[in-house]
Design a protein with these regions (language model features):
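Histidine- and acidic-residue-rich, metal-dependent catalytic cores
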Residues: 82-349
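Membrane-cytosol interface segments
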Residues: 1-101, 333-337, 342-345
Length: 349
């Protein structure tokens, strides 16, 4: 997208920053791609930032994007993509071959929104159905993988392959018994051992497809391998994983935490960021994780949230060094989660 250099004033509210903004001392104030809210505008003025780059955007962006009619159409297409994936997985479960054209169609649609990620993320955040997790998870991981690949500077062809890897990473679950996939509670040891086979099953499903690159195939079989070598199916270390698998691993874990499951409710993205920090570099590649922490929180600025005490607020800022601790405005008062550690967000609205 094109950028323009503009003065810092109320006219830029709702716009997206076109580059990282730093203080005179070289400390980042706000990262690129952040939506400019009242809180962020005040922060820019406070640090005497007089001009910045913003993206030239079409009307679906900015402070009014949620109200735009295009969002409802996006949601319809997102649900259509989930249904397409559902048919693809159910066909596999019934013994049919992979219908690669379905995977291609969904992947191409997701890629077509690469410069319209705000509305795409709105779809991911607003449509969450526990019973459809197996199918929506594949679409969501594709979206998150695309974002990570984009932020890491991958080429168009590489980004498309990463999307496909995200979409196919769990196709092996089509061979896992339904009662294990949808068990309302933790798996026992035997069930977990069966569940772990899905990575190999997935590879077996796609290994002879000449339209799928080896990089994508490796991502499918390696997405549960950990950086420290304690993952599965082979227990290899991060140095032996390819970049696609590293990206899909991060996207997979993030969506699993933030999705509605049959055995627990969905967690907020900020809870997910905290869990990812706890998991750390033993599981996820450092570069991928740091990109996620730097860029992804920006998509939740402006989100309406319900606090544990029942108050309704809005996320107005996320510190660059503390992705799990946003600033939330409630009736003109600000909760800074780096300070107000007793205050918790219950859910996104």
């Amino acid at each position: 997208m094109q950028k323009e250099y503009v003065e810092v004033n109320e006219g830029i509210l709702g716009s997206f920053l076109g580059e990282d903004v730093y203080t005179m001392n070289g400390n980042m104030i706000v990262p690129s791609d952040t939506i400019i809210t009242d809180y962020i505008l005040k922060k820019l003025i406070e640090f005497k930032i007089y001009k910045i780059f913003i993206y030239k955007t079409d009307p679906i962006y900015g402070e009014e994007f949620i109200k735009n009619e295009k969002i409802s159409e996006d949601q319809k297409r997102y649900i259509e993509d989930i249904n397409t994936v559902k048919v693809m997985i159910q066909d596999l479960a019934s013994g049919k071959e992979l219908d690669f054209s379905k995977a291609e169609d969904v992947s191409e649609h997701i890629y077509s929104r690469i410069n319209d990620c705000v509305s795409l993320m709105e779809c991911v955040n607003s449509v969450r159905i526990a019973d459809e997790y197996t199918y929506s998870h594949l679409v969501n991981v594709s979206v998150y993988s695309m974002l990570l690949a984009k932020w890491m500077g991958l080429s168009k062809s590489q980004i498309k392959e990463v999307i496909l890897a995200g979409l196919l990473h769990d196709v092996g679950k089509s061979r896992i018994p339904h009662e294990i996939l949808n068990k309302k509670g933790p798996l026992d040891e035997k069930e977990f051992e069966e569940m772990k086979k899905h990575a190999v099953y997935g590879y077996e499903i796609i290994k002879n497809n000449k339209d799928i690159s080896m990089s994508v195939k490796r991502a499918v079989i390696m997405h549960h391998e950990k950086e420290n070598g304690t993952g599965y199916p082979y227990g290899i270390k991060g140095s032996h994983k390819n970049l696609y698998s590293k990206i899909v691993t991060a996207a997979d874990i993030f969506d699993a935490i933030t999705s509605e499951r049959v055995y627990r409710g969905r967690q907020t993205p900020f809870t997910a960021f905290k869990e990812l920090e706890n998991i750390g570099f033993d599981t996820i590649d450092p570069k991928v994780l740091m990109i996620m922490f730097t860029k992804m929180p920006n998509y939740y600025i402006g989100a309406k949230v319900k606090m544990e005490n029942g108050e309704i607020g809005e996320v107005v800022y996320v510190p660059n060094q503390c992705a799990y601790a946003p600033v939330v405005e409630v009736n003109g008062n600000f909760y800074d989660f780096t300070i107000d550690k007793e205050v918790l967000i219950k859910e996104f609205l």
